[in-house]
A protein has these predicted regions:
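Canonical Rossmann dinucleotide-binding motif of NAD(H)/NADP(H)-dependent dehydrogenases/reductases
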Residues: 2-34, 180
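Conserved glycine-rich Rossmann-like NAD(P)H-binding loop of the short-chain dehydrogenase/reductase
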Residues: 29-45
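The beta1-alpha1 cofactor-binding region of Rossmann-like NAD(H)/NADP(H)-dependent oxidoreductases
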Residues: 40-41, 57-70, 109
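Substrate-binding pocket helix/loop in short-chain dehydrogenase/reductase
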Residues: 93-104, 108-113, 214-215
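Active-site helix of classical SDR
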Residues: 127, 169, 177
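Alpha-helical segment proximal to the catalytic Tyr-Lys
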Residues: 132, 181-183
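Residue(s) in the substrate-gating loop at a strand-loop-helix junction
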Residues: 153
């Protein structure tokens, strides 16, 4: 697929971090881009700067995602590219003891569910709805109808302390990639998943320095 102004793309989590870098890269090629992100304070000026369309979308909510696709398609036409970067994390041990008070706590199940809903279910929700739209398009001369890229993490295969929910969510993204790719292969839609390592994004920036150092120490290459 040649990246130019004839192509429309949607990037979830596109207001910052890896998603933001993806938006910049696509716009540099002339691709029409819509950003799905809940952070309006960051998303609106970033979209204005890059020439993208900002859509305030919560990937855990069906109606919000439907409205986002409708807004993006009204502005840019049916997307041929979907890049899923929307995601979040937290840090809770499965169970642990407070060294000072002796209090014992377990992983808050609502926080576990929140990570799964955003990182895994939200990713699938956007894939399914985007793929349905892509099916209305003709196949390009090079044989492509559409392309979907998902973001997992090295944490899916090498999870660290306190990362049970995050690792599970990203492992789920990896696990569903091949079945989805097979589902859509006969329709000329490619599906791939990347496993980024550790790099400086707003998600990581909010972590304490000792946590960032501990995570960085586990990344083999590149540092």
């Amino acid at each position: 697929m040649k990246l130019d102004s004839s192509i429309s793309a949607i990037v979830t989590g596109g207001a910052s971090g890896l998603g933001g870098a993806t938006v910049r890269a696509l716009r540099a090629k002339g691709v029409k881009v819509a950003i799905f992100d809940m952070n309006e304070k960051t998303g609106v000026p970033f979209a204005a700067e890059t020439g993208a369309v900002y859509c305030n979308v919560n990937v855990t909510n069906d109606a919000s995602v439907d409205a986002g696709f409708a807004q993006a398609r009204a502005a840019n036409g049916q997307e041929r590219i979907l890049v899923n970067c929307a995601g979040t994390g937290n840090a809770f041990k499965t169970a642990g003891r407070n060294k000072e008070t002796g209090e014992i706590k377990s992983f808050p199940i609502d926080q576990f569910d929140r990570i799964i809903q955003i990182n895994l279910v939200g990713t699938f929700r956007c894939i399914a709805k985007s793929a349905a739209g892509m099916l209305t398009l003709d196949v390009l001369p090079d044989g492509d109808r559409g392309a979907i890229v998902n973001t997992a993490s090295v944490a899916a295969e090498d999870g660290q302390i306190g990362q049970a929910a995050y690792s599970a969510s990203k492992g789920g993204v990896i696990g569903m990639t091949l079945p989805i790719a097979r589902d859509l292969s006969t329709e000329s839609i490619r599906v791939n998943t990347i496993l980024p390592g550790l790099f400086n994004t707003p998600l990581l920036a909010g972590a304490p320095e000792n946590v960032k150092a501990a995570l960085a120490a586990t990344v083999l290459n590149p540092k």
